[in-house]
Amino acid sequence: MKYIVVLGDGMADEPIAELGGKTPMEAACTPVMDELAGKGSLGTVQNVPQGMAPGSDVANLSVLGYDPAENYSGRSPLEALSVGVAMEDNDVIFRSNIVTLTDDEPYEEKTILDHSSGEIATADADVLMETIREKFNNDTFQFYTGTSYRHILVWKNGRVAKLEPPHDHLGSVIGPFLPQEEVLRNMMKESFPILNEHPLNRARAAAGKNKANSLWFWGAGTKPRVQNFREKTGLKGAMISAVDLLKGIAVGAGMQVCQVEGATGSIDTNFEGKAQAAIDALLKDGCDFAYIHVEAPDEMGHQGKVQEKVKSIEYLDSRLIAPVKQAMEEAGEDFRMLILPDHPTPIRIRTHTGDPVPYLLYDSTRQRKKQERFTEETARAADNFEPNGYRLIERLIAAE
């Protein structure tokens, strides 16, 4: 038996007028997920425990079977694992976004336009991060390049600071959301003229692209301690994801991390390549479990792009789930598949909520026959609620 999780990050949403009162999941054409819904079971799950911020870090730990209340030490340390950052117990790790701010006002009066700097390419971001390292790296502060706009700051023997995620404040004046920790606030402020006038950003502006013109720190945490996934479940696991957070969780859990060329973390990602990576892990590499994470619906939610969010869900269905299902069937391999979001990312607010999300659980050996769709509403109507997200994987493995 093989076990597969397909995680459509931020896929759940609310009814949207532009879609005739439907959610993106309802508006999307998803024949494969609907087929599996008719043959499997539906429900809802609370991946984000009450009182915890509704981040992909907390929610994906839950889906993988780790209680965030016991295993979560911050988002950035998990991301740091994926880029090979060596951490000491007293280090504090931060996510260091490169964001787009307005040009003209004093720093505290600038508006944040884009948390992703137009989804800047990693190669371009590394050029800017090298300039940042030349300016700021020392025995206390060390910057590391991650992926696209997502990078890492290590503060040796630092202090955990309360910080605001930039994607929660798009379109807002930044002053009220800047760090209270003076050294962090000053570093962000000093980064602006360095980045804003960088030749690469001048070229981006000339090409009509968003400048990547300021650092933004958030997601502080300390060295993570995550139980080995194989020891915990008895399964050899593989992670397929474009984003450092998920790769870092996998590194911490001792899972195989599959590299996929063209995996971008957005709607232009290599869906087919991710599907093939999962197929190879399960059928060639001896893995029992594959976790396929797709960031695209979440990014489209943050950007407020309704039609693109619908399209990302359709791509998930036709370009990823369909070939994985077909490969398992052609190989004669029994499998169970869990399909779900980690959290909602509603277009209306362009950020995460901690609400319950729909899930679909399919077992190729125990099929029922029913006409069904996989949507938020059909999952709620199933009246099958799991209040502790970290327990849902037990249903996958035990096929309850």
Feature roles, as predicted:
Residues 1-400:
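Feature captures the catalytic ectodomains and active-site-proximal regions of enzymes
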